[in-house]
């Protein structure tokens, strides 16, 4: 017994009928050009402060161009870190770079080149150049010590840094910097700036163009100049910062990728 009553398919009288009475489907009108422009794929940027610890990027991050940083990673001793913290506690303008915004300890960087951008498709070429170079070095380590304190500004004049100048104990570092400069020249057609300074930044603060001008002009009537001058000339216990540091590898950061090249002999 069937649950549903229906006529047998073999007994239908309308088998030869064709369905031709359906109304013709109307075409959807084309969208206006402004709509296509609205959703047109554009270069992605990652300039929101949430990507940069609350800071606004001075230079836009454009899709396909990857940020390059070449540096020596420095693990400061407990004594030096303690000295830095004590020094920073004596003022309120600068924030320590020894920890992230989430209070995660991090190592500091001694940059051996300016930061620059390369096309993503050329990143393997840059990595290969550093592999070849570090595999043919005639030394295993570089030794340096901290020099005097200085105040530095980024190119956009939006941030300033407290830093220690770095003094190397031999001449090997010069060839390393020369190679880094050659890489930047090859991939960006830019030369290393003449005032490039080997340094380790340990604290930062927001700033602006007016403060930068007050500093470079050494405007002694400026409250900002007098305050910053007092900070970098603060008498600190030199024995806390007199240690020598040894590094045995180079770091190359390309976008979110980090490559380590040990110094081989």
UniProtKB/Swiss-Prot annotation:
Keyword Thylakoid: no
Top-rank EC class of the record's enzyme: lyase
Keywords: Hydrolase, Lyase, Nuclease, Nucleus
One GO cellular component, as annotated: nucleus
InterPro entries recorded: Usb1
Impact after mutating residue 109 to A: Does not affect expression. Does not affect interaction with U6 RNA. Does not restore U6 processing when overexpressed in usb1 knockout cell. Impairs pre-mRNA splicing when overexpressed in usb1 knockout cell
Residue positions of the active site: 109, 199
EC number: 4.6.1.-
Binding positions (UMP): 197-201
Binding-site residues, AMP: 109-111, 195-201
Effects seen without this gene: Deletion of mpn1 decreases cell population growth at low temperature and leads to a generalized pre-mRNA splicing defect, decrease of mature U6 snRNA levels, abnormal U6 snRNA 3'-end processing, decrease levels of U4/U6 di-snRNPs.
Reaction(s) the record says it catalyses: a 3'-end uridylyl-uridine-RNA = a 3'-end 2',3'-cyclophospho-uridine-RNA + uridine
Subcellular location: Nucleus
One Pfam family of this chain: HVSL
Stretches the record annotates as Disordered: 1-22
Swiss-Prot/TrEMBL GO biological process terms: U6 snRNA 3'-end processing
GO molecular function, one term: 3'-5'-RNA exonuclease activity
Keyword flag Nucleus: yes
Family named by the database record: Belongs to the 2H phosphoesterase superfamily. USB1 family.
Function according to Swiss-Prot or TrEMBL: 3'-5' RNA exonuclease that trims the 3' end of oligo(U) tracts of the pre-U6 small nuclear RNA (snRNA) molecule, leading to the formation of a U6 snRNA 3' end-terminated with a 2',3'-cyclic phosphate.d. Participates in the U6 snRNA 3' end processing that prevents U6 snRNA degradation.
Protein name: U6 snRNA phosphodiesterase 1
Organism of provenance: Schizosaccharomyces pombe (strain 972 / ATCC 24843)
Gene assigned in the entry: usb1
